[in-house]
UniProtKB/Swiss-Prot annotation:
It is an enzyme of class 7 (translocase). InterPro entries: ATPase_P-typ_cation-transptr_C, ATPase_P-typ_cation-transptr_N, ATPase_P-typ_cyto_dom_N, ATPase_P-typ_P_site, ATPase_P-typ_TM_dom_sf, ATPase_P-typ_transduc_dom_A_sf, Ca_ATPase_N_dom, HAD-like_sf. One of its GO terms (biological process) is monoatomic anion homeostasis. The gene is ACA4. Its main location: membrane. PROSITE patterns: ATPASE_E1_E2. Residues 1-157, 218-345, 414-804, 856-875, 933-950, 1005-1030 are cytoplasmic. It is a multi-pass membrane protein. Belongs to the cation transport ATPase (P-type) (TC 3.A.3) family. Type IIB subfamily. It catalyses: Ca(2+)(in) + ATP + H2O = Ca(2+)(out) + ADP + phosphate + H(+). One of its GO terms (molecular function) is P-type calcium transporter activity. This is Calcium-transporting ATPase 4, plasma membrane-type. It comes from Arabidopsis thaliana.
Length: 1030
């Protein structure tokens, strides 16, 4: 089978165009190409989109480079005139939406200057730059300037899915056969008896189409809901005089937006104020170099990314008036990138389809030959009647229906169904799967490289200890939870200046007047510490003018700010990783509050304090300052600072993380912590989580960086903790792990984590702490930033794989039995025991209902007690082939005995004996599939009933199948070619079906694999990680 599937191999992430085209062209037997490829990306549309995108980028590039220069030579009078409408005037605005859009799109700084700059423009859109808009104004602003939403492709109606299901070529042929059958039947047998056979086929087709359409429609609704979740972005704005968070879709013209590193610019706008703002415009213009935005170059375009710095912007254009909106409009709903399992099952379906087509043709040929020979031997070869035509038509319908059953169209579609179900469940469990393949690949992950802060820990940080003036003070757990620090007025003032000036966060009042701190958890902890010391954020910010800000980034691991002092000169404050900032200091504030030189003895003493804090699992930060005669023109100095304080921030480990790590280890998944924290803090937290164990290695990023490639490969399997790491270190670790055959999942939250997220097999971005850049490069977004959620994604990834294996085992058994029983019977008796209507019903049990029952089963406990699914493992395992062969042989023997000796065994005689026998065969065949569907719940384990009632879908499908079978046999005989059965015959059919359970138990006792695993799972990996988990 592996050799036959050579053309059906694709990479899980970023598959090559050649591989994608190769497997598409290899799919030769398809009943309904429209439906089969509905969820698969259309390569022609993709190429069309890329061309349109390129055209828009070229247009924007012209605006950036040509129009900027041209505008200097254009007379103001030559610019288009925008007449103010009465509606705009009545709403209180004095500028048109199109004029705002044109100014930003053309980078028209001259027009902005003529209007008086951003301050005067704010007045034209009736907004205060300090207070923001009022929430009550949002509806009128949306009416005048538009909503911040992009044109979406209309949702497909249910009737569209019905129409799509009708495109099945075999169903179309059957419909033609049914219509002809009705015509010929009425002519020969009269009305209404002559209509029964054809009408039965038409009703069966209608049922198949409706069930298929309902299943596909529900799937499409799930994907649409998930797509909406992907587009949700939260932005920070100033409204009603306070800073607050809103959805990107609620943004309106006039909003004052706060931007920081990693944010996506949510609309077109104009720079108000900020520091070192660098914008990545490659998504729009294709330019790789970042653009510096300031008061001289003030225009910001929607869809671009903040690469560095921070700023406030005034929103001027939203929705479809922006260039980003126009680009989004060109996006086509071309489906998802195909997953490896979908491609592989397309291959399996193609191979089986070819076999089925051959059997169908042979069956028709054999039936026709037998019919002609019978006519020849009876001497009526020259006399042909309409009844003979009806018989031949019936043979043709049976042959076509064999193709319906034999071409397992449901195999690749079952993967989509299972993934959609898993994605919906994961969404409710706080994980948003952005790419289908990620859920599937997560089932094969052998290693998770996880951040510490917020993922393993709660991210609810508080300053627990502080060293200042040679004293260590601990937080007092009292009614006010305050620190009792005895500081001189000068030291306290300097400390509070450093806390409140050197921050990217804000202290605001909410609508109820309560104090609220907006910003990262670390910033919130330090600001809360400042408030506990009696500081006032707003007073401090008003006292000093900020001259320059160098925002925190994960490379420098520090943040700095420069403020102007009232008496002249300037003061630089810096805070950051203790070891790094300590090296920048020349002085320290001693016990008397005086600044004294930082001797080697004092450095050792402070280092011991830092180490002591870190060993208690506290994150440590140093707060330092430096006075300057004048503001430097370039970057702030990296030396000559005075140490003020070391703070220890407590960030408790999340409840359940240790158990989640143990679950991973039991499942053969190695967990590695990669953090920017001090190595002592990292080791303490890793031990608490169960990650750092005896025999494991904890290493600093700088040490790892200096290793040769050979040395790296030698120690990487032992690494459990990497501390003080840079984003580049994480990328290098991930890259090397993949080279040694690991399937790597990696978490990230910062902009600089994007390369590692992109490099990993599965990129996991944090939904709360993660930047938009990180989320855009991720495959899965962990909405609650919780490590337990990551483990849940792995659990569902494995469930998808094993569920599809169950479905494939079930479907192939039905394929084999249906094909052989009809073919052999046609060869020997000249008739097929299963009619077209019956085969259509079996096809629905097998395809749509079977997929619903088996492909949507929730994960069981045993899934995380096995090793990861090996990428190279054969999808259809020896164990599955054993089960398929054993069940097929049993069913063929029993049904064959009934077919050839049933009348004598069941003592059937009379005119309806053949009809009764064929009904018993049909009934027994269906109940064989019902019980085999239950068997398929477990490929290897004997107890197939465990957890069966936990899956309501499975229970519902079983109930519906049995109820419909009773209706078909007892009440729809005229259409389904059945007759009502006695209770003895019903009991016999159920008994024959239930014996499948005993056959399954016997089969599962037959060993077929020498290894101690099943179902495509590999042995637990050897090495330090597995031994530790043991």
């Amino acid at each position: 089978m592996s050799n036959l599937l050579r053309d059906f191999e694709v990479e899980a992430k970023n598959p090559s165009l050649e591989a994608r085209q190769r497997w598409r062209s290899s799919v030769s037997i398809v009943k309904n190409r429209t439906r089969r490829f509905r969820n698969i990306r259309d390569l022609d549309k993709l190429a069309d989109y890329e061309n349109k995108k390129h055209q828009i980028q070229e247009k924007i590039r012209v605006a950036f480079f040509v129009q900027k220069a041209a505008l200097h030579f254009i007379d103001a009078a030559a610019r288009p005139e925008y007449k103010l409408t009465d509606e705009v005037k009545k709403a209180g605005f004095s500028i048109e939406a199109d004029e705002l859009a044109s100014m930003v799109r053309k980078n028209d700084t001259k027009s902005l200057a003529q209007k008086g700059g951003v301050e005067e423009l704010a007045k034209k859109v009736s907004v205060s730059l300090s207070e923001g808009i009022r929430s009550s104004e949002v509806p009128i602003r949306e009416k005048i300037f538009g909503e911040n939403r992009y044109t979406e492709k209309p949702a497909r109606s249910f009737l569209m899915f019905v129409w799509e299901a009708l495109h099945d070529i075999t169903l179309i042929i059957l419909m033609v056969c049914a219509v002809v059958s009705i015509g010929v039947g009425v002519a020969t047998e009269g009305f209404p008896r002559g209509m029964y056979d054809g009408t039965g086929i038409l009703l069966s087709i209608l049922l198949v189409v409706m069930v298929t359409a309902i299943s596909d429609y529900k799937q499409s609704l799930q994907f649409r809901d998930l797509d909406r979740e992907k587009k949700k972005i939260i932005v920070q704005v100033t409204r009603d005089g306070s800073r607050q968070e809103i959805s990107i879709h609620d943004l309106v013209v006039g909003d004052v937006v706060h931007l920081s590193i990693g944010d996506q610019v949510p609309a077109d706008g104009i720079f108000i104020s900020g520091y070192n703002l660098e914008i990545d415009e490659s998504s729009l213009s294709g330019e790789s170099e970042p653009s510096h935005v300031n008061k001289e170059k003030p225009f910001l375009l929607s869809g671009t990314k903040v690469q560095n710095g921070s700023a406030k912007m005034l929103v001027t254009t939203v929705g479809m008036r922006t260039e980003w909106g126009k680009l989004m409009e060109t996006l086509v709903d071309g489906g998802e990138d195909e997953t490896p399992l979908q491609v592989k099952l397309n291959g399996v379906a193609t191979i089986i389809g070819k076999i089925g087509l051959s059997f169908a043709v042979l069956t028709f040929v054999v039936l026709c030959i037998r019919f002609v020979l019978d006519k020849a031997t009876s001497g009526s070869f020259t006399n042909w009647s309409s009844e003979d035509a009806l018989t031949l038509l019936d043979y043709f319908a049976i042959s076509v229906t064999i193709i319906v059953v034999a071409v397992p169209e449901g195999l690749p579609l079952a993967v989509t169904l299972s993934l959609a179900f898993a994605m919906k469940k994961l969404m409710s469990d706080r994980a948003l799967v952005r790419h289908l393949a990620a859920c599937e690949t997560m089932g094969s992950s052998t290693c998770i490289c996880t951040d510490k802060t917020g993922t393993l820990t709660t991210n609810h940080m508080v300053v627990n200890k502080v060293w200042i003036c040679d004293k260590v003070q601990e937080r007092q757990e009292g009614s006010k939870e305050s620190f009792e620090l005895e500081l001189s007025e000068e030291v306290q003032s300097t400390l509070l200046q450093g806390i409140f000036q050197n921050t990217g966060s804000e202290v605001v009042k909410d609508k109820d007047g309560n104090t609220q701190i907006l910003g990262s958890p670390t910033e919130r902890a330090i600001l809360e510490f400042g408030l506990l010391l009696g500081g006032d954020f707003n007073t401090q910010r008003k006292e000093h003018k900020i001259l320059k800000i160098e925002p925190f980034n994960s490379d420098k691991k520090k943040m700095s700010v420069l403020i102007a002092l009232p008496g002249g000169g300037a003061r630089a404050f810096c805070k950051g990783a203790s070891e790094i900032v300590l090296k920048m200091c020349e002085n320290v504030v001693d016990s008397n509050g005086e600044s004294v030189p930082l001797t080697e003895e004092r450095i050792t003493s402070i280092s011991d304090i830092i180490e002591g804090f870190a060993s208690e699992a506290l994150r440590t930060l140093c707060l330092v300052y430096k006075d300057l005669d004048e503001a430097p023109s370039g970057e702030l100095p990296d030396g000559g600072y005075t140490m003020v304080a070391v703070v220890g921030i407590k960030d408790p480990v999340r409840p359940g993380v240790r158990e989640a790590v143990q679950t991973c280890q039991a499942a053969g998944i190695t967990v590695r912590m990669v953090t920017g924290d001090n190595i002592s803090t990292a080791k303490a937290i890793a031990k608490e989580c169960g990650i750092y164990t005896e025999g494991g290695l904890a290493i600093e990023g700088s040490e790892f960086r200096d290793l040769s490639p050979h040395e790296m490969r030698a120690i990487i399997p032992k690494i459990q903790v990497m501390a003080r790491s840079l984003p580049l270190d994480k990328h290098t670790l991930v890259s090397n792990l993949r080279k040694i055959g690991e399937v790597v999942a990696v978490t990230g939250d910062g902009t600089n984590d994007a390369p590692a997220l992109h490099e990993a097999d599965i990129g996991l971005a944090m939904g709360i702490a993660g930047t938009e850049v990180a989320k855009e490069n991720a495959d899965v977004i962990i909405m609650d930033d919780n490590f337990k959620t990551i483990v849940n994604v792995a659990r569902w990834g494995r469930a998808v794989y094993i569920n599809i294996q169950k479905f494939v085992q079930f479907q192939l058994t039905v394929n084999v039995v249906a094909l052989i029983i009809n073919f052999v019977s046609a060869c020997i008796t000249g008739s097929a025991p299963l009619t077209a209507v019956q085969l259509l019903w079996v096809n629905m049990i097998m395809d749509t209902l079977g997929a619903l029952a088996l492909a949507t089963e929730p994960p069981n406990e045993g899934l995380m007690k096995r090793a990861p699914i090996a990428r190279t493992a054969s999808f259809i395992t020896k164990t599955m082939w054993r089960n398929i062969a054993g069940q097929s042989v049993y069913q063929l023997i029993v049904l064959g005995i009934l077919n050839f000796a049933g009348k004598s065994l069941l003592k059937l005689d009379g005119p309806d004996s053949t009809a009764v026998l064929n009904t018993v065969i049909f009934n027994s065949f269906v109940f064989c599939q019902v019980f085999n569907e239950i068997n398929s719940r477990e490929i290897e384990k004997i107890n197939v009933f465990k957890g069966m009632f936990n899956s309501w879908v499975f229970t519902w499908v079983m109930t519906v199948t049995v109820v419909f079978q009773v209706i078909i046999v007892e009440f729809l005989g005229a259409f389904a070619s059945t007759v009502p059965l006695s209770w003895q015959h019903w009991l016999l059919s159920i008994l024959i079906g239930s014996l499948n359970m005993i056959v399954a138990v016997i089969l599962k006792c037959v060993p077929v694999e020498s290894r101690h695993h099943h179902d495509g799972y590999d042995l637990l990996p050897s090495g330090p990680s597995s031994s530790n988990s043991a």
